[in-house]
Amino acid sequence: MQNLNKTEKTFFGQPRGLLTLFQTEFWERFSYYGMRAILVYYLYALTTADNAGLGLPKAQAMAIVSIYGALVYLSTIVGGWVADRLLGASRTIFLGGILITLGHIALATPFGLSSLFVALFLIILGTGMLKPNISNMVGHLYSKDDSRRDTGFNIFVVGINMGSLIAPLIVGTVGQGVNYHLGFSLAAIGMIFALFAYWYGRLRHFPEIGREPSNPMDSKARRNFLITLTIVVIVAIIGFFLLYQASPANFINNFINVLSIIGIVVPIIYFVMMFTSKKVESDERRKLTAYIPLFLSAIVFWAIEEQSSTIIAVWGESRSNLDPTWFGITFHIDPSWYQLLNPLFIVLLSPIFVRLWNKLGERQPSTIVKFGLGLMLTGISYLIMTLPGLLNGTSGRASALWLVLMFAVQMAGELLVSPVGLSVSTKLAPVAFQSQMMAMWFLADSTSQAINAQITPLFKAATEVHFFAITGIIGIIVGIILLIVKKPILKLMGDVR
């Protein structure tokens, strides 16, 4: 770890390296959420439109976006492993940034489905390499007893939210209003800024941090890894080819189905691996058992929350009034702008929850209660979305304020689930599987989006009310079940609350 001077106050009293990581993550999130804000629209926009897209069916477009999200979170396992065993965190982050940049450049080219699949592959792999490791780098800027650590992470999260907040406004406006490929170009430019900020700042402020892998392979293990990787790549290419040959017309749907299965099976393998490991003590196994209902609940939560870039995006474009008149003034709304409501309400509501938990102290609700209430709020947010269809039918346009209200309630639910889930994942983790348990939390999101790839195609005008109602009720029921069974879960959790 770098020897840091605690008296150095150049970035809100924090180490100067934090500014580098803040800027890197700001631009990476700008790139990620900017692209995601317009991706589904690009996929189903007609090829003959003035702002042409790929002309895919809406159901297929939503499934592709869901699978993309699932693989992004699944790839974080690979990124963490590469940093720990092969390259070190620093080089892994930079390589990931290069791959993301190349992916956005590929999306900016007018080569149709070919460039789409190449681009998504590069962005998925690059994000998996950058995302988990840059958070780890923030921690390495501080010694374990440095009181500035928590504040540093809070500042880092502000960078994430700021990038997420402005991305839909800039990339969305240009992408939908002018040209999709130009919008993707802006996302690529954002990643170039991220790469430059990281390269320049790393050399100046923390050249030694993350330079080497923490658990490097010996030469024999490295050779075996390269052989295994070569075999996996060859098998994947052959499988890809056979899947296409089996049914060219249904290739995309078959590909989505295969990836959905992978997204669901991987967490099961992880749980089995931890439960059967001889390194896990009996007390740790009980805590791991307590984590299962929380993990399953998180899948339900993320399945609803992650539909903001698919189902909610489609609803915003096809069902909301994009030219509302407020206070006598007519506004125009680009549908992609709705994606900024998520980070906006996170920014607005976070201080309220922080102050509430600080005030309650030891009297604040347990993890199980927070999870249950969060899921119930998330379910209620979807029940809110049934009202436009119930009140006025599903053929016309509804007020944009329905989406504002939905996001406000849903983000309140997220603040009860997401930070608590991160925290409890570390607390319930067996000593031998600390990093893997953090990966499990990301896998809950991955699994939820793998499931979404199968259920989002069910959403259409004729099923709108039923879809929102059933999905919302499921969220509420799961939340209620958690509250009912909280005592046996808390008993399994032991001293963790």
Curated annotation (Swiss-Prot):
Subcellular location: Cell membrane
Record-level GO cellular component terms: plasma membrane
PROSITE patterns: MFS, PTR2_1, PTR2_2
Ubl conjugation keyword on record: no
A Gene Ontology BP annotation from the UniProt entry: oligopeptide transport
Parts of the chain that traverse the membrane: 37-55, 65-83, 93-111, 116-134, 155-173, 182-200, 225-243, 255-273, 294-312, 336-354, 373-391, 426-444
Extracellular side: 56-64, 112-115, 174-181, 244-254, 313-335, 392-425
Membrane protein topology class: Multi-pass membrane protein
InterPro entries hit by this protein: Dipep/tripep_permease, MFS_dom, MFS_trans_sf, MFS_Transporters, POT_fam, PTR2_symporter_CS
Molecular function terms, GO-annotated: peptide transmembrane transporter activity
UniProt entry keywords in alphabetical sequence: Cell membrane, Membrane, Peptide transport, Protein transport, Transmembrane, Transmembrane helix, Transport
Cytoplasmic-side segments: 1-36, 84-92, 135-154, 201-224, 274-293, 355-372, 445-497
Entry keyword annotation includes Kinase: no
Pfam families: PTR2
Function: Proton-dependent uptake of di- or tri-peptides.
Family membership: Belongs to the major facilitator superfamily. Proton-dependent oligopeptide transporter (POT/PTR) (TC 2.A.17) family.
Protein name per the record: Di-/tripeptide transporter
Native species: Lactococcus lactis subsp. lactis (strain IL1403) (Streptococcus lactis)
UniProt gene name: dtpT
